[in-house]
Amino acid sequence: MILSHRWQCTIVPVDSGRQRRAYPEGVTENLNTIDSIRLLRLDPGLPMPRRAHRGDAGVDLHSTTDVVIAPGHRELVGTGVAIALPLGTVGLIHPRSGLAAREGLSIVNAPGTVDADYRGEIKVCLINLDPSTPITITRGDRIAQLIIQRVELVDFVEVDELDETTRGDQGHGSTGRGSTA
């Protein structure tokens, strides 16, 4: 494997004897740092997404509309922004912890995924998990947070069998139950 300490790898040998790119075509920048993401404001009346505190992982996304979400119901809410992510990255839309704890507001498909080639408005599918109280969202409210992460864009290779492990095919609640052998 050819790797530099700054992740500027171009070729990785693969068991099949062929070679493939370690990162998708078009990724040439230093992958240790992403200084900025191109953002298009579709609603200039809303604040720019930004971190509440310097070390926060996510930036706050704001609602473009007023909406009332009935208990147990969901609404697709626009954020008024579109972004251009570099190949090899993903945007993850997470609930805001305070809204989840105080109001029962969450995201249906948490975390939501913004793929690198998507250029449309980021929308959030919000759900009211409170059993009895509607949630009122006002235009401009912070409704979710966006986190940018690197992803491995791998190829899948079909095989006849997988290597053996202690866990094997035990899943969904099997951890801590002891051996099935």
UniProtKB/Swiss-Prot annotation:
CDD domains cross-referenced by the UniProt entry: trimeric_dUTPase
CC cofactor: Mg(2+)
InterPro entries (UniProt xref): dUTPase, dUTPase-like, dUTPase-like_sf, dUTPase_trimeric
Domain of life: Bacteria
GO BP annotations, alphabetical order: dUMP biosynthetic process; dUTP catabolic process
Catalytic activity: dUTP + H2O = dUMP + diphosphate + H(+)
Role, per record: This enzyme is involved in nucleotide metabolism: it produces dUMP, the immediate precursor of thymidine nucleotides and it decreases the intracellular concentration of dUTP so that uracil cannot be incorporated into DNA.
NCBIfam families (UniProt xref): dut, PRK00601.1
Protein name (record): Deoxyuridine 5'-triphosphate nucleotidohydrolase
Taxon lineage: Bacteria, Bacillati, Actinomycetota, Actinomycetes, Mycobacteriales
